[in-house]
Amino acid sequence: MSALTWAVAAVVTDPSGRVLLCRQSGGGRRWALPGGRLRRDESPPAAARREIRAETGWEVELVDLVGLYRLGDPAAPPPRAGHCGALPDVLVHVFRARVLGDAPAGTAAGGCHLDWHPPDALPEALTPTTRTAVADALAGRSGVLREPAHHLPPGQRAAGEVGTTRP
């Protein structure tokens, strides 16, 4: 079993309801939510604000926690040094957030192309977790717990959620 990696991400919206997505310059070049790993002794909300500010330049208000999303395969062996391998076991805290202000407060880190997308016109090249988390956030869900399909008991759907919808 691999060590669990704790991460954060946020479905960041602007006043018109568009969603901020980041397209990494390497890898499969899919769009994802802004976010990153927690630092030692850092709370998930503090990490989310820090990562979003560093990656996008925007200051945000965290509205609430959409849910926890588990990625990867904890049973997968670690990759050999210098080689790609299975995604490590990652637990992502996904928040719902709003931008503060009319423009970024700082400079975005390199390596990420940022763009705003209307919720009804999201790009096709989204990571599966991003697609699911955005749908959950825009539907007003909170307290969602999601795992990849290969971690679920037989007969349980991968798209099923535990949680509530905000009034």
Question: What does each of the following model-derived ranges do?
Answer:
Residues 135-167:
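Charged phosphate-binding loop/patch that engages nucleotide di/tri-phosphates or the phosphate backbone
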Residues 4, 29, 89-91:
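Residue-level preference for beta-strand/loop junctions
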Residues 1-19, 37:
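Conserved N-terminal beta-strand and adjoining loop/helix that marks the start
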Residues 63-67:
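Conserved S-adenosyl-L-methionine
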Residues 32-35:
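A short gly/proline-enriched turn/hairpin at secondary-structure junctions
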Residues 38-61, 71-135, 163-167:
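Unchanged
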